[in-house]
């Protein structure tokens, strides 16, 4: 199966397919058009691209000849041939749009892979595509440290290390550093035989927030590994809205019902489906993007 990547600009998807033979990504033209026009209507994006392609062809633009076609999954779940462009082609396309959004898009597009998140996401892809994932302890603090260490090794000097400082987010203070070791032992010993128990364990680990940074990205992988081992399930994160997820996680400190519901509705038995896990990584990192 093709390797799929999803990036997000202003909460809109930009999908890409990996070309193994040429070692590069091909990006969906219609996704880029939708982003640049701030338009979610598929038909309008398709018609605009048809118009623009004709215009560029008349002008003798290299962009049209650089366009390729690859299969991508549509809204109906089926795969269809769609126009795609490589990295340089996307920049050319963006530069043909006469609006301020295009310049911001180009800045985001050319910079996003070089950020800590961009480099960490590449490491997350590699983790799932290697045998290393099979060596991670499931449901333990050690396993979570292994995940964090792999995702952020070489990016943070505290990668894979339990924090020794107390941290807060907004008005909420996570587990005090002096009690964190004891709290993590309690969480590790929590049962994980049922879905309810697994969600409870996940919520408690989030409240503990054992690392200085990178907790959510690491803990979502940790959760999926528990679900896979215990229930032969995993979460299809692409089915969980970012705002709803973040709100549910905030509420989970006093009420776990919202996050329980979101996770339950997104459960899938596609535990060996490569695309499901790759999309999961994309969405997991998307949750952490600042609005």
Predicted features along the sequence, with ranges:
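FIC/Doc superfamily catalytic core
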Residues: 95-291
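An anion-engaging/catalytic patch
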Residues: 1-112
């Amino acid at each position: 199966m093709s390797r799929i990547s999803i990036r997000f600009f202003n909460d809109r998807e930009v999908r890409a397919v990996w070309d193994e033979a040429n070692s590069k990504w091909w990006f969906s033209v219609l996704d880029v058009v939708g982003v640049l026009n701030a338009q979610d209507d598929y038909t309008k994006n398709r018609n605009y691209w048809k118009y623009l392609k004709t215009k560029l062809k008349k002008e003798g633009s290299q962009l049209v000849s650089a366009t390729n076609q690859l299969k991508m999954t549509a809204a109906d779940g089926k795969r269809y041939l769609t126009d795609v462009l490589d990295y340089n082609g996307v920049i050319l396309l963006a530069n043909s749009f006469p609006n301020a959004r295009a310049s911001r898009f180009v800045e985001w597009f050319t910079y996003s892979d070089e950020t800590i998140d961009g480099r960490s996401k590449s490491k997350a892809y590699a983790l799932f595509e290697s045998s290393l994932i099979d060596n991670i302890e499931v449901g333990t603090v050690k396993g979570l440290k292994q995940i964090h260490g792999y995702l952020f090794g070489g990016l943070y000097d505290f990668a894979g290390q339990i924090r020794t400082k107390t941290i807060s987010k907004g008005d909420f203070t996570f587990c005090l550093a002096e009690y964190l070791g004891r709290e993590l032992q309690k969480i590790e010993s929590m049962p994980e035989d049922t879905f309810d128990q697994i969600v409870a364990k996940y919520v408690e680990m989030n409240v503990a927030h054992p690392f200085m940074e990178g907790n959510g990205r690491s803990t979502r992988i940790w959760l999926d590994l528990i679900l896979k081992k215990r229930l032969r399930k995993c979460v299809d994160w692409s089915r969980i809205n970012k705002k709803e997820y973040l709100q549910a996680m905030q509420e989970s400190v006093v009420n776990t019902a919202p996050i329980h519901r979101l996770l339950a509705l997104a459960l899938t038995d596609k535990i060996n489906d490569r695309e499901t896990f790759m999309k999961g990584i994309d969405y997991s990192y998307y949750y952490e993007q600042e609005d």
